[in-house]
Amino acid sequence: MQNGKDDSKMKLKTIICLTLAVILALSCLAGCQGTENPVPASDPPATKEPQGKPEEPVPAVPLSAVINAKALGFSAFDNQLVEYLKQAGRADENFTVSPLSFKAALTMAALGAEGETQAQLLEALGFRSVDEMRAWYATVLAGVDRFDAFFTEMEKEAAELAEYFPDAANSQERTAAYWVVNSVWSNQDLPGEFRQSFLDEIAKTCYAEAYSAKAAELANAVNAWVNEKTNGLIPSILDDASDTSAVLVNALYLKTGWEDGFAKLGDRDFTTRSGEKVQKPFMEQTAHMAYYKDEQTQLVSVPLQGGVSMVFVLGEDTGLADKLSKAEYKLVDVTVPMIDVETTLNQKELVNYLKLLGCEKMFTDTAEFDPMYTDPLCVADIIQKAKVHTDEEGLEAAAVTAIVMNATGVLREPETPEIFCADQPFSFYILKDGASPELLFWGQIVN
């Protein structure tokens, strides 16, 4: 409830910060079974010249269409990625993507690159230097710490309350979780290993773990790690990695509840982009939250616990940050469908996107990853799997991004509430708080 104009503005600013960070999406390649325990990577010297050059896929979207994309209000990299995927054939389908997971994996690649390869990566990511990139990743980890601190404080308060009211004590274990974790993997049966200086760098900057496995077990080992780090939401990311020299993997997982719970409404009509009506399970809540409406856009920012918000947008979603800054804290009756969307992206989209931004050298046999590995490597594929699920209780989402690196360089294929009713195509954003909020997930529901 509002306790005056100043309190309302302060609370609104907090919600806006939380809202500007949860839009990232996840994608993954299928395949996986059990695995033997992976062993930590070591660093013996070896040399092997890469053979051949990865096939150059033809970009499906012109660079001008991406660079001139209308800003959503986040970083240029995030904005252009969303616009590229829309124009590359996904405009009329439900999909989600995780810019944060993608950028985190590319951060490890940039830390292991040098020369033109590193310069192209930094420019694409929007960083002027490696130090600026390190500073950005530190803000990502700080957001994770704030999420944990929120629930730690709640548990502390609950424990203190239980001393006076033991019958009211809640002994349930914490189910909310948010983490951004990284690992790197080398193939024991192929020449070369990660350099210790690189492992030290990514451990310090990204808290990354290093492993190695035999060729036949590499995919299973990576998939087992992915399954664990996403709480089973994404069971696998690789099919076969027997010819893969190294893999850089990021995993992001988020689970939290709504600050005010939704009520189930049952199945209702949802009008798709083509005008067809389909049945979807809907939910509803009425509460005070950030709300904005103009002739082109209607949006509402629904808060979740732990400094996270989910922004639902009807109509035009350009200039989101500016519109959120103009949002008012109002009583809103929100009716939205439950979301269950999963997307897989690979080199046809992610590699093409990076090439449009000028990242060419990392995909060729002249890629400069000597600071990372004792053998020459190039990027053979980039794959991501993202999944977002919402219901009346809250949100669960995960993303995994894997950068596959080969020596051969062969690519693999009582107020009156405002009414917000998303019974037609809409986009959504999942945001984490911070001075420069991160877009964890973006998605659209059109069918």
What is each of the regions a protein language model found here?
Residues 1-9:
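Short, Lys/Arg-enriched N-terminal segments with co-localized hydrophobic residues
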Residues 5, 16-17, 24, 28-211:
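Detector for small/aliphatic-rich hydrophobic stretches
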Residues 11-15, 19:
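Bacterial Sec-dependent N-terminal signal peptides
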Residues 71, 75, 99, 115, ...:
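Conserved structured core elements
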Residues 92, 131-314, 325-412:
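Non-catalytic, conformational "gating/processing" segments within enzyme and secreted inhibitor domains
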Residues 96, 104, 183, 310-313, ...:
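Structural recognition of the beta-strand scaffold that forms the well-ordered cores
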Residues 386, 392-447:
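C-terminal soluble interaction/assembly domains
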